[in-house]
Amino acid sequence: MDLESEIIQLVRQNIRPKFPSLNDEQQARLDNALKYDVNYDILKKELVEYIDDWKRNEYYDVLTNIGDLQRLDLGNMLNGDGVSFPKLHSDLANLPRFRLIDNENEMDQSLLHKYDSLRTRLIEKCRAIELIRSATNTDVNYQDINSMLSVVELRQWRDEIQMEWKELAQNLELILKTWPDLTEEKRSKLLQLIDSSSLKSILHIKDNIE
């Protein structure tokens, strides 16, 4: 049931007088005798106007009590010539840290705990904001990286590279063993290439050839 229906139901329930001294039958006879004709469309219209007036008065009360504070001013407090995040971070870090000595008052301990907790949380949030800002200003194109990661399955890509690397090593081994016209100079260069690369961990070509 919406608010409008609830209000109309309450009006219907309370528009006729109720007498605790009457029993149900007597109350029903009284209700039938006092039939009020209520125009609920007019009631709804007046109700909406009343709510609008109430909202308007509440707004003016807030505006009067707080003052004409521009939303832009809130932004300038942390930008431009106002208080910067590094300055705010530094000021928070320089706030004193208190300690109770010979004081077991629970209210004092609770207040001190809240102060330290709030100070720590504010420092951590300022530090996090500074890190996010510095990461945002770097030259790394995160959009390109994310798009690449969404297209390439890195694990599958790594497995394919390992298979191709092993196939390359096997081909080199075959070349060294079966090519009769391969000169000693070229053979030596290939062996040096294998010896200085990751192929050495895959094949022991040098030992087999020699």
Swiss-Prot record:
Localization terms from the record: Nucleus; Chromosome, Centromere, Kinetochore
GO cellular component: kinetochore; nucleus
Example GO BP: cell division
Keyword list, A-Z: Cell cycle, Cell division, Centromere, Chromosome, Kinetochore, Meiosis, Mitosis, Nucleus
Keyword Methyltransferase: no
Primary localization class, coarse: nucleus
Transmembrane segments: none
General function of this protein: Component of the kinetochore, a multiprotein complex that assembles on centromeric DNA and attaches chromosomes to spindle microtubules, mediating chromosome segregation and sister chromatid segregation during meiosis and mitosis. Component of the inner kinetochore constitutive centromere-associated network (CCAN), which serves as a structural platform for outer kinetochore assembly.
Family, per entry: Belongs to the NKP1 family.
Subunit structure: Component of the inner kinetochore constitutive centromere-associated network (CCAN) (also known as central kinetochore CTF19 complex in yeast). NKP1 interacts directly with OKP1 and AME1.
The protein, known as: Inner kinetochore subunit NKP1
Organism in which the protein naturally occurs: Kluyveromyces lactis (strain ATCC 8585 / CBS 2359 / DSM 70799 / NBRC 1267 / NRRL Y-1140 / WM37)
